[in-house]
From Swiss-Prot:
The lineage of its organism: Eukaryota, Viridiplantae, Streptophyta, Embryophyta, Tracheophyta. Residues 45-70, 174-194, 240-267, 321-346, 416-425, 473-479 are extracellular. This is Potassium transporter 25. GO terms for biological process: potassium ion transport. Its main location: membrane. One of its GO terms (molecular function) is potassium ion transmembrane transporter activity.
Amino acid sequence: MDLEAAHGAAAAPGKRRRRARESWGASLLLAYQSLGVVYGDVATSPLYVYKSAFAGDDIQHSAGNEEIYGVLSFVFWTLTLISLVKYVLIVLRADDGGEGGTFALYSLICRHVRAGLLPGGAGDELAVGGRRDARAMSRLRAMLERYRVLQRLLLLFALLGTCMVIGDGVLTPAVSVYSAVSGLELSMEHEHHKYVQLPVTCAILIGLFALQHYGTHRVGFIFAPIVCVWLLCISAIGVYNIVHWNHHVYRALSPYYMYQFLKKTQTGGWMSLGGILLCVTGSEAMYADLGHFSQSSIKIAFMSVVYPALVLAYMGQAAYISQHHSFENAYHIGFYVSVPEKLRWPVLVIAILAAVVGSQAVITGTFSIIKQCSSLSCFPGVKIVHTSSTVHGQIYIPEINWILMILCLAVTLGFRNTKHLANAQGLAVITVMLVTTCLMSLVIVLCWNKSIFLALGFLIFFGTIEVLYFSASLVKFHEGAWVPITLSFIFMIVMCVWHYGTIKKYEFDFQNKVSVNWLLNLGPSLGIVRVRGIGLIHTELVSGIPAIFSHFVTNLPAFHQVLVFLCVKSVPVPHVQPEERFLVGRIGPKEYRLYRVIVRYGYRDVQKDDIEFEKDLVSSIAEFIRSGDSHHNGVLEDTDKSCEKLSSISNGIPLWMEDGEVDASASPHKETDTQIISPNRKKARFVLPKNAQVDSEVRRELQELMDAREAGMSFILGHSYMKAKSGSSFIKRIVINFFYEFLRRNSRGPSYAATIPHASTLEVGMVYQV
């Protein structure tokens, strides 16, 4: 035994080392893959940063090189402080169940503080450990929980950041592709170039958006190599320019040159900051795409590959420009002029490919954030297509895709130059960063339980830097910065109107729900004819009987033998574990055959198709019946208060299919003697554990459930028409009767309802006076 123990002790370090090597190997693989998904945008920023900073008459390149050295110093420290320190070292730690982004920060705060305005929220907040500086935190928490106006401001702030991300999804493809194609300017005659650049840019953009429905997984394997080649290319050119033109350019990394730059250029230098801040565009993607990778992989990729390559690229451009002062045209202050002439065509091709990769990442991120907003009732329902069977985050939204394409082409054709496009993108980028800084300061106090002074230090330090850039971008309102403001205003109106209407609809349902006593007093037959089958009544309520049901049975007194009130909720967490997805309860005595099922999805979860959903639903109800709910699971104990107990069903009773496959791991199970055959379905049986003690009453209820499933399942969907009640204000009538109704008529229904067979669906119309 001693020898075995000694051998085990000696082997343990070897196992730990092997696991560590495997972990590092997985992180390195993810880091490599993240180059193509996360860093395409920030990697292409050298194409237009210097060109945007020197655009117009804000600053001029002089023989003393104060301007170019000052711009390089600002670029270096902005990239270091914002991208490296703020995002990589701090913000990446604030993940919401592994997910990132502006809305993830908002949902994280709402779960720790009861500050959510979303109907049918997630319930109690998560337990938080530690109470450091509890007095200051409790005061801040109490204010957010007590004052409804602060909750609304918090939601509006999160929506502002979301709208600017959508605006960035419009502007980034235009800026990146247009800047990449601008390399043709130095490779062909000017007379030919002016007829080529715009059509080529538009053709690439149309092709980019037209191919979205194929999904990034089909060409994703080449994304990382393209970005790797691009980063290697710009860093090698940077090293060449530093060695060949000005190897003392590293001195410009000193903050002293920022002071000299502002001292000499004054107002012009401050206004040029709007172009300099584009060096950090794409930094938000590191946080937004956190769900697809890990913190360690994103940190490894940025700190070891992306950051050094970008610094070398910016230093190389500055080294070349510092030795060339006789530029005839402004476009010479840019990327391609610093590329050796023999390499311009290959670099041009790589740049265009890298710009497409960067644009793809932003477009996919826009799809993801709109899906999050739609899941949390902050955006009208849209069609969501999952383009990958393995990576759930890869989605495609047709309506949003074509809207983005039209807007992207509109700004490209409207501005026709990098200056105005860059001004527009700069304001969108810095606004999102400001929102992230403010929300992050709340996370530090409320979620991490750190000192409020630490949060204030974070807010003041990074907020001051970003406010400086924000002010420089805002003064360019008439030179392109009005575009993201206009786009965000339009999307903000859409989101606020939809959210307001959704809340009013939920409040109407809640206030007009029917008492459970009314239903129980009808008797086991509910006072109506009970026909074979399962009836699913969709409701937003987690308790009580929806008014739509009483409206239905009053006009058509017949219903199914098994009645299920189905509530599908999106909760403010990224993912809900399968064993926690279904909550099942019983309404009234067993002979009524009334059940309530609440199905919970996270804002990043993928909802199943109708066959899988129906199968899981019936299996969960069957497991609820088998588990002996009459004692403690889901019995309606206090009908006056409509207090129902719901049970979380971890694993439903699996179904044995006709071809011999079992839907769950059920090898040690035996089947009941219940068997059904349906012309439209495979025959199925419940599979019970071998040691299960099933009495005759439970077996009879399971038999009835399977008979009802054999007869068919019908979905009753409420089709509500919102009308502002008499006496409402003029603004409310406009918002509800026109704006909200317009959005409702042109939006998709619930995502699970889209997969329900039309022959099994019945819509019941009802007017809501709100």
